[in-house]
A protein has these predicted regions:
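N-terminal basic/disordered segments at the start of proteins
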Residues: 6-32, 36
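Hydrophobic faces of well-ordered beta-strands that scaffold small-molecule active sites
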Residues: 9-14, 31-33, 66-70, 97-99, ...
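Active-site-proximal loop/turn and secondary-structure-junction residues that shape catalytic pockets
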Residues: 14-18, 37, 70-76, 102-104, ...
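Conserved, mostly hydrophobic/aromatic
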Residues: 23, 101, 134, 166
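Glycine-rich, proline-tolerant flexible connector loops at the mouths of alpha/beta enzymes
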Residues: 32-51, 69-81
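Active-site-adjacent beta->alpha loops and helix N-cap segments on the catalytic face
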Residues: 41-53, 78, 100-112, 147-161
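N-terminal active-site wall of soluble small-molecule enzyme domains
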Residues: 58, 64-133
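Conserved small/polar residues in nucleotide/adenosyl-binding loops
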Residues: 187-188
């Protein structure tokens, strides 16, 4: 019996509407963008709702999806307006939000049913038990921590059916907040 391998989704960052269009035209299956709220890159040229909607419509012509990074760490008072923001994303056709903070995950799940929630790499998921935890809370995909090795990724894949995303190119973070990864690199 021959096992058919699933083709991985090619997911590209898109910092502007022009970059979104180029990524999709050149074969990206999906793009991730930042909105004007709830993202870590608050100083970047993030998308307005109108630009997001235009991007969603453009991507749909190519069979591609648009995800929005909502990966900020919530501080007291940041939650105001989040429910409405997630509902609007869902209503304009955003395929999923990429979230790391449990408060934002809870708000997105309760306020915007039907909007897929992916766990951001910022949440530092490094083992299958963590993936199972987030699955129980309704997340459909987990972006593994960038520090996960290929061997660890393979083992995680064997032990869970949660959809996995992994960075394969680009910037590498070398530390977690409060965790020293330099000593871990000495082990390998």
């Amino acid at each position: 019996m021959t096992k058919t391998l699933k083709r991985p989704e090619v997911l590209s960052p898109a910092g502007t509407l022009e970059k979104l269009k180029v990524a999709v035209q050149y074969g990206a299956d999906a793009v991730f963008i930042g909105g004007q709220a709830y993202g870590l890159r608050s100083r970047a040229g993030n998308f307005t709702f109108e630009q997001m909607e235009e991007g969603v419509q453009f991507a749909a012509k190519y069979g591609a999806k648009v995800y929005v990074a909502a990966n900020m760490v919530m501080h007291e008072g940041n939650e105001e307006g989040a429910g409405e923001w997630f509902r609007k994303l869902r209503d304009i056709g955003i395929a999923a939000v990429i979230v790391s903070d449990p408060a934002l995950i809870m708000i997105a799940a309760t306020e915007a049913p039907g909007l897929e929630i992916h766990l951001s790499t910022q949440a530092s998921a490094t083992n299958y038990e963590t993936l199972e935890f987030w699955k129980e809370l309704g997340l459909t995909r987990v972006v593994l921590a960038r520090e996960v090795s290929m061997e660890e990724l393979a083992e995680i894949r064997k032990r869970t059916d949660v959809e996995i995303e992994a960075f394969v190119h680009g910037a590498m973070c070398i530390s977690y907040s409060g965790r020293c990864t330099l000593s871990r690199s000495e082990e390998h």
